[in-house]
Each structure stands twice: as C-alpha cells, then as structure tokens.
Amino acid sequence: MATYNGDKYLREQVDSLLAQSYATLEFIFVDDASSDSSLAILKAYAAKDSRIQLIENSVNQGLIATFEIGIRAAKGEMIALSDQDDVWLPEKIGLLAAAIGPYSLIYANSALSNASGEVTGKYSDRNHLCDYPNALNYVFGTKAMGHAMLFKREIIDLALPFAEFVGHDYILGFAAASLNGVRYFPQTLVNYRQHNWNTVGADLSKGKKNYTTRKERNARIVKRLELIASRCPAGSEREILKKLARNFASTSLMSRTSRFLTVAKHHRAMLAYKGKSDLGSFLYSFKLLISIF
C-alpha cells in the first residue's frame, strides 16, 4: 500500500487489509513523506503486527515510484496493490488467488462507494470489464484497475521500472497480457471510494487529458507505444506494436492508411476494452484515417 496524507480513511483500509482471510500474507506499507498523521498511524499498526513492513520515503516521490518501491520489497509469489482510501472485502485475496490459475494477473470488479463509504453502484456499471489475453489488448486502453489486481512475480521484470507517463496499473496489466494473460473476476471485492481527492476516478472515459494540442497528444501516444513495444516479448505482437509506433509518429496519408489497416485487422483485440460489437469495433478503426483516436 502506498500512502500520502491519507489519514482520513487510512485506519478503515488497514483494518480491512489485516482482516483478509487468506492464511499467509505480508503487508508492505510505503509512506511517501506524509505531512499528516498517516505515518504515525502506520507505525502504530506495525508495532502490533509482525506481518507489516513499513518503509518511509525521506522525500516525496509520487504514487507510481512509491508503488514500485513496495513491489520491489515484496517477497511473495503473488502481489496485490492497495490504495489508502478503499475497503477490501475479507475474502478478496483468497478468492483471487484461488481463481488466477495459469493467468499472470487477475482483477476483480469493484463496488463504488461515496466519501462516507455508502455503496452507490459497481465499477462495471460504467466500464466494460473483460479478459485481456494478449499484448494487443493494451494498444488503446484498458479498464483493469490496480486496486483490484492480484499478479504473479513473473511479470515484474517486464513491468519495472515504471514509466512516469503511463499508469502503473496499465504497465502491470500489459506485462501480464504479454505473458500468460489477464483474467477478469466479476465479483465485487473492493469498495472503491469516490471522493474529491481520488487520483483516478471510476469513470475512465472522463479522465484528465494530459495534452493540450493534437501534436502533443500524438507524441504521447507514440511514446507509450514505443514503451510497450520495448517491453513486449519477441514475436508477432511486438512487431505489430513497433509498426504502430512508427505509423502513429507520422501524419502522412500512407501512415494513416497503414495504421487503419493494422487496427482493422486486429480490431477485436485492440478494442476489446470498449465492449463494442464486432462490427462496431471494426467501424471504429476507420477513425484512424483521420485522427489518432
């Protein structure tokens, strides 16, 4: 769990973590130089529970870097990430560990709750959730959130080090899809708290845009495609990703046509996260003749 100035909801989340029914767990809490009482709260828990390892960042490093510190410190064969303001159901880890099978990563549905903890719906009400069996599923996006994941150690070498310009859960999911795939578990196992200080909210279609111009947007997409191509194991999927990165870097008609043909050929995989019909995802690929998205 990564913490930063989260004392308002922290005790409730830590209590839910320590109450997990799975028999053998270690808890790694990494505080990112909080200025509130978060660190003191964690120290009090660590003094009472030998399963807790507490790491203190001397200076603030940000959420992504803090999660990487925690992952590198983990000793278990499977790892789960926790936000500081949610509440886990007691059976979360046990059910996911039992269901992960040969997959590299499994993620659950989440219940949405308001700032007071009252459940208001499901994450799947706003987002299409599905399996991601191969790397091409991550070309345009994904709806697998980090707080709902359980993943195997086998993905760490592909996923780390994290890049600051993409989400940590995105690259973890991509690494898993590149190896033995990502499995969706439809049961809600986390109360995902929605409030004004969320880093990412439940409706991913309304996320903050990290660009101001089309040129800047295109440059970010190329950078992301180059990253995942470099992390993808050798094979046909890696070559497709490299080709897309080259084509997205150019605005020429030839490049737009090439990326359209590539996406049209692989539209089921690349647009799986949108939950469109087969025809709908095919027609969506025509947009690439005009723009990136």
Q: What does each model-found stretch correspond to?
A:
Residues 1-205:
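Nucleotide-sugar donor-binding/catalytic module of glycosyltransferases
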Residues 165, 170, 193-293:
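C-terminal subregions of glycosyltransferases and related glycan-biosynthesis enzymes
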